[in-house]
Design a protein with these regions (language model features):
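Conserved histidine-centered catalytic loops in small-molecule metabolism enzymes
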Residues: 48-80, 101-107, 183-207
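Phosphate-handling substructures
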Residues: 28, 69-127, 195, 204
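Generic beta-sheet signal
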Residues: 5, 142-150
Length: 207
């Protein structure tokens, strides 16, 4: 039987200082992020789910909570869904007063194809595929939800669709609380990908 594994990016994080939080613990959703999570929970009500998985990070767990509340299912924490590793976490990364102002950090930026600042794309793809198929197997004949993070979701989708992994981060199609759905065939293999933004009306205005 065909299945769909929905990968959801977490909602907006409370981060007034614009810090790269990465895998740091304790980053919670903003009020708007909590609204996004409620919208995603309502969106999920129509689904027939057999598994709900999440990244271990707080922002992902807060995003998945309304989904769990809509379905009588246990929540599984999967380390493979965690944010991409990044040596810059805990710092600002912006022109002017951020990391780009400090030459000692430039050595990490020279080769985005094999990012020296964090987790190699190949490793990211491998663990995200493991997460996808783990959710598939846990769901039985039903669909599944995995709550994760922008870069892991986007790189997984790019690999599946044959897109170049080297990319402009500003052009990723993976907004806050968005849904990237991997549709599987009767053999459990990825057949196609679709994308939607149930919480689009809550997205911050682009500057």
């Amino acid at each position: 039987m065909a299945q769909t594994i929905h990968f959801i990016r977490h909602g907006e994080v409370f981060n007034p200082e614009k810090i790269l939080y990465g895998r740091q613990p304790g980053w919670r959703l903003s009020e708007r992020g909590q609204e996004m999570a409620q919208v995603i929970g309502d969106w999920s009500a129509a689904l027939s789910l057999g598994a709900i998985h999440t990244s271990p990070l707080q922002r992902a767990k807060e995003t998945v909570a309304p989904i769990v509340a809509k379905h009588n299912l246990p929540l599984a924490v999967d380390e493979n869904l965690i944010e991409a590793g990044n040596i810059f976490e805990g710092k600002k990364f912006e022109l002017g007063n951020g990391l780009l102002k400090h030459p000692d950090m430039w050595r990490y930026l020279w080769n985005p194809w094999k990012p020296s600042w964090g987790e190699p794309y190949e490793e990211l793809i491998s663990r995200m595929l493991k997460a996808l198929f783990f959710a598939r197997d846990n769901a039985g004949d039903k669909d599944a939800i995995c709550v994760s993070h922008q870069l892991p979701i986007w790189i997984l989708r790019s690999a599946v669709e044959g897109r170049r992994l080297l990319h402009d981060p500003r052009k990723r199609e993976c907004t806050l609380a968005s849904v990237t759905s991997f549709h599987l065939d009767s053999e459990g293999m990825i057949e196609s990908v679709s994308y939607s933004e149930p919480a689009k009306h809550l997205l911050p205005a682009k500057k």
